[in-house]
Structure formats: C-alpha cells, structure tokens
C-alpha cells in the first residue's frame, strides 16, 4: 500500500507523486534524527549498518592514519579497516575489552598515537552482548581530537543511545532494534569530521556539476533511495519511541535472564558471560558434544530460530575462546514471551 501512495522517486521530479514521496522521506529523516538527538540534514539513509560504517571509515580515515578498534568488532568494521591497512598504509591497533570499564578505556588510551585518526568500536558485542563504555571512550576521543565512529547495530533501539553521548558518527542497522525492513541503515554525524563520499552519482541537486554536492545529506546519498525501506524504518522508530527503549530493554533482559536461569542448571551447557560486565539482551552458549551448527539445527526442528557460528565477528570469538566452532546465539525481541523462553530452555535441556 505504501508504494501505491508513495511510489515516486524522492527528489526527482515535481509531480504530485514525487512530492508526496519526498515529504515522507523527509519526515522519516526527521523522525530518525529526533530519536537519536541529531539533525535531519546530518542523518544519512544507508543500505545497512555495514554500508554506513564503510561510509564513515573510508570517508574519514586517510593514508598513513592510525585507528584503534576493539577486540569485539564485527567484520563490518574489521574488513574495511583491514582493506585500508593493505591498500592505503593505514595502521590499526586492537584494544582488549575488559569486564572493568576503566581497564577498557585505559587499553584504548594506551594505544593512542600522534597520527591516531579514529576510534572505531561497537557499542555492544553482537556475540556476547557485552556493552562497551562508549560514553567514556567518546570523552577520550574528544580529549585527544580523535573521531569516534560507533557501530550501534546491537544497541540502537535497546539502549538509550544519543548523539549527546559524544560519538561523532553513529552507524546503525534499520532491521534490528529499530524494527525496520531489511536493507535499511543510518549514519548520523555531528559534522566535526567531514566525510568524503564513498559513492558518486545523481542526487537530484546541482546536477550540472561533476562533483558531489558539498552539503548533507546529498553529499553522501546518491541514486534512488530505498523508499519502501525508509518508510518502514520510520514506522519502526515510531514504534520503538512509543514503546520506550527502557521497556524494550527490560523485557528482553527478562527473557535473557529467564533463559540464563535455566541454562545454569544444565552442566552440559557453557554460557559466555562474565561477572561484572554489562550486557545487552544477548545470550551466547554451547552444548557439550554438539557443534553450534548442530545445536541450532536441532532447535530449528523444534521451531526455535537461533544463529550459530562466528556471527561475522571472529575477533570476539577469538577473545572468548570459540574461534574454532563459534556459539549459538539467542537474541529475543519485544515480541517474545516468557512461555516461549521456557519452551526454548526445555528444548535445550532435552537435546
């Protein structure tokens, strides 16, 4: 139905269908910006969080710069950085994440060099859910004039993430905690570190020039936008705003705690959490004598959807000692119920 009413190409043409569509896209931009405390013009629609992170990393980091990442990063950070190390002479240091936030910040601080350009880190691990001290890391970046690029894929919509937390660039997915459609993402910048375009093409503005426009969002958005996805993202953000991130976090954490309480009674199960650390609502585990893939397949046969393997985050699995086989990951949503969690726990017990 949305495409019947808003099937125009935003910013291209002056007829009514396009005008209606453009208004909806701008409203979605305003909704996303307001939710994270950013400005609409500095809110960029992306294909996903990986696209947003590539925009930020490749648009900020230059040849011979130095960057610091954590040892919990997703390949959406690790692979762009690795490519820049190979191809542009960029230097990269990896800071270990501790259960003690002060130790984590100290590890990042100890790796700062005169040519450090950016700290690039996840707000919460997609493997274990461990929450990094991102506000303190943002303060560290500000102290040293370093850009902080934040991967918010596992945190946005669940944790109260705001641009006022201090990150310079926030990247996130639309299809996870924001309940939008797949193929959507966001990059929000405070513009203190100008981002060079990653893609070049039509914007519907300054079309006579060969260069990309020098103003946002046009400078970083080119080609036809994912209109249907953007409208779904607007609806998802409105839902999260109405429900409340605190309520979502509480419900999902209650689901995790229920499963954890059941898993702790099963000697054959290993759970990858450490006392003293803060966690987003994610539980990673393994069952003795079963690979993570076998466990997930058996649970799938019983109607439970869990992801197995390395979760595109080999550094995190190396850190917790599961690089050879990965883990099984449970990540509930606001729509899961406690009876469903109990049924999952019983299914795991009976494997």
List PLM regions with ranges.
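Pyridoxal 5′-phosphate
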Residues: 1-351
């Amino acid at each position: 139905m949305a495409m019947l009413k808003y099937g125009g190409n935003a910013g291209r043409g002056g007829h009514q269908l396009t005008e209606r569509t453009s208004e909806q896209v701008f409203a979605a931009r305003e909704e996303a910006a307001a939710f994270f405390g950013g400005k609409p013009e500095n809110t960029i629609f992306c294909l996903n969080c990986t696209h947003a992170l590539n925009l930020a990393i490749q648009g900020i980091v230059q040849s011979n710069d130095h960057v610091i990442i954590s040892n919990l990063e997703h390949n959406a950070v690790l692979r762009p950085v690795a490519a820049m190390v190979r191809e542009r002479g960029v230097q990269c240091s990896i800071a270990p994440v501790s259960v003690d936030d002060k130790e984590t910040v100290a590890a990042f601080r100890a790796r700062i060099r005169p040519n450090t350009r950016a700290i690039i880190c996840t707000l919460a691990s997609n493997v274990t859910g461990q929450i990094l001290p991102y506000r303190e890391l943002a303060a560290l970046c500000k102290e040293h004039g370093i850009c902080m690029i934040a991967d918010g894929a596992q945190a946005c919509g669940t944790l109260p993430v705001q641009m006022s937390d201090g990150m310079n660039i926030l990247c996130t997915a639309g299809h996870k905690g924001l309940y939008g459609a797949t193929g959507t993402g966001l990059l929000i910048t405070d513009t203190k570190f100008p981002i060079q375009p990653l893609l070049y093409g039509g914007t519907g503005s300054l079309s006579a020039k060969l260069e990309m426009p020098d103003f946002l969002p046009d400078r970083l958005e080119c080609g036809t936008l994912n209109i249907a996805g953007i409208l779904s993202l607007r609806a998802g953000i409105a839902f999260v705003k109405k429900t409340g991130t605190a309520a979502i976090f509480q419900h999902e954490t209650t689901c995790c705690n229920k499963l954890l309480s059941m898993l702790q009674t099963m000697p054959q199960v290993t759970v990858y959490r450490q006392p003293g650390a803060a966690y987003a609502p994610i539980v990673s585990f393994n069952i003795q004598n079963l690979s993570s893939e076998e466990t997930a397949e058996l649970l799938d046969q019983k109607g439970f959807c869990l992801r197995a393997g390395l979760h595109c985050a080999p550094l995190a699995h190396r850190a917790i000692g599961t690089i050879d086989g990965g883990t099984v990951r449970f990540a509930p949503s606001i729509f899961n119920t406690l009876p469903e969690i109990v049924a999952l726990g019983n299914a795991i017990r009976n494997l």
